[in-house]
């Protein structure tokens, strides 16, 4: 996989993002804004500059070999793929934790991924105008994707 380019914008949706409902217009609007600009997805941050999720995905970063994803709360939807990826990381002993991280942390990450049922684990190589690390898919993503692919066939 060559990796994806994504947009980033402040999350202007209501503050009950953990409730999956039919009121997903805000998500669609964020996605369409990024898509019109040639992006695969749009990563969202809150008023404090912390990454929450993407318009239809959960967000992960890797820094110094450790995988981070925002903790579950009312600002993000608890994705099924997110849960499965965390289980794969745990089983394989890959360092990971649920922790808030900033836009700067995202921009300076070694790797960025998005997870969703449709995207599975999508490596991101560019966020806005910022290239992530060397602009190539990283080794921790490769390992996580292999583990996730095996898990899918075990279920």
Language-model-detected regions and their locations in the chain:
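Helix-start/capping segments and mature chain N-termini
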Residues: 1-155
